[in-house]
């Protein structure tokens, strides 16, 4: 229902779709970046808490830790305990984080839609914050589909494919394809589950393409934007 609500809101009011200006809800770029970073980690923390609660409700152990996705610092829930469950019981704990994100996005969109329709009149600062949350949630949900990283959608696809160690087997496969594999790496790949090896044969190309895309994004956008914000801060 939340997903349908989001789609209907965007269709009814295309202006609700986040623009680049939503990344600056406060008076200055530096303060806006700090606010976005804090907001991101707060929402991601709640996202991971949902994973943890769902895993505990399913009767398996789970833990939340700080990790990274490429050059991004993230929260991560260890859900390896789900492998002890039947496959059909693993999906809900894997998908509940995106469910939380969608519910938050739907609530924010309804508030913004109500404001545009004149049902309430938020202060400009609050309207900017709601637009920024929309941006964070759209980006957050979109990034879950980056299956070349260990995202929720990656975990769902790996589960649906019957894999248990796809990530490590993919890295071993890439080493072998590039000629960087040691005898130990080749032996580990041969000992891996046949299903993981079969899926890794095509997933490795998706992973490699994703890494190239991520490297381009870092060089073209992430690093220059970070340098500009730091330079602006130091020059004040």
PLM region descriptions:
Residues 1-42:
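Topogenic membrane-insertion module of multi-pass membrane proteins
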Residues 1-4, 92-103, 203-214:
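Select subsegments of transmembrane alpha-helices in polytopic membrane proteins
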Residues 2-11, 110, 210-219:
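Hydrophobic core of alpha-helical transmembrane segments in multi-pass integral membrane proteins
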Residues 16-23, 120, 227-236:
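Membrane-interfacial helical/loop segments at transmembrane boundaries in membrane proteins
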Residues 31-188:
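Membrane-embedded catalytic scaffold of the fatty acid hydroxylase/desaturase
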Residues 146-236:
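C-terminal membrane-associated helical module and adjoining short loops/tails
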């Amino acid at each position: 229902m939340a997903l349908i609500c989001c789609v209907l809101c965007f269709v009814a009011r295309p202006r609700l779709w986040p623009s680049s200006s939503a990344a600056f809800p406060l008076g200055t770029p530096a303060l806006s970046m700090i606010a976005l970073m804090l907001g991101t980690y707060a929402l991601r923390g709640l996202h991971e808490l949902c994973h943890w609660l769902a895993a505990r409700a399913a009767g398996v152990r789970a833990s939340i830790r700080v990790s990274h996705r490429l050059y991004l610092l993230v929260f991560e829930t260890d859900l390896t305990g789900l492998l002890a469950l039947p496959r059909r019981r693993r999906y809900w704990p894997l998908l509940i984080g995106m469910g939380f994100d969608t519910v938050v996005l739907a609530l924010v969109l309804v508030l913004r839609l109500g404001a545009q329709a004149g049902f309430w009149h938020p202060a400009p600062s609050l309207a900017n914050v709601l637009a920024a949350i929309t941006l964070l949630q759209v980006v957050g949900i979109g990034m879950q589909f980056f299956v070349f990283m260990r995202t929720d959608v990656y975990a769902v696809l790996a589960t649906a494919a019957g894999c248990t160690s796809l990530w490590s087997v993919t890295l071993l496969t890439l080493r072998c394809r590039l000629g960087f594999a040691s005898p130990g790496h080749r032996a580990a790949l041969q000992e891996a589950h046949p299903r993981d090896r079969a899926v890794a044969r095509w997933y490795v190309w998706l992973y490699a393409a994703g890494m190239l895309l991520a490297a381009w994004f870092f060089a073209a956008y992430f690093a220059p934007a970070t340098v500009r914000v730091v330079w602006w801060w130091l020059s004040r």
